[in-house]
Amino acid sequence: SLSVTDSGVFLMGDTRCAFYDNAGQQTGMYAYTGTLVGGSSENGKAALLFENETKRRSSLVLLDSVGADPRQIDFDMVVKNVHVMDENAYVLTKVGMETYSFDGTQKSSVEVSDSYDDFLRIDKYLFLFGYDKIDRMDFAN
């Protein structure tokens, strides 16, 4: 996966990811310690989703291009998806939607049913995608 901003590039590969500035110099790198199952990046921020299938748990790693230490958030369940939007990481679990700032602080949480697999935030609305339906709900930070 490749994400380009005015200040540089974020490159996500199979075993590691890295940030590069406009001069091509690496400004940050993270080597994966688990099985990468998803990720998202926007404006120099990245959220990586790792899964431990034997323990049925997930971990979210939050990265900032400025070289801050990675923040890891562990979940006692499998996380379905993650997206970076509006300077936050949005996480869809089996039971809810959670929002995290990149310092690892949980900003909000709302319950949702387990029938959704993906989502998209547009303005103050959250669109939840299931196998055969799309639902919209209000979701302000």
Which residues fall in each region the model found?
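A short beta-strand motif characteristic of beta-propeller blades
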Residues: 24-31, 67-74, 105-111
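Structural motif
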Residues: 14-20, 55-62, 96-101, 133-140
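C-terminal structured domain segments
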Residues: 96-116
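Acidic, serine/threonine- and glycine-rich low-complexity intrinsically disordered segments
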Residues: 1-54, 59-61
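Short loop/turn segments that connect beta-strands within the blades of beta-propeller domains
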Residues: 5-6, 13-15, 42, 56, ...
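Blade-level signature of beta-propeller repeat domains, shared across WD40, Kelch, NHL, RCC1
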Residues: 111-141
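Loop/turn-rich, solvent-exposed surfaces of beta-rich toroidal or solenoidal domains
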Residues: 49-56, 60-61, 67-99
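Repeated scaffold domains used in trafficking and secretory/extracellular systems
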Residues: 1-7, 31-44, 74-87, 113-125
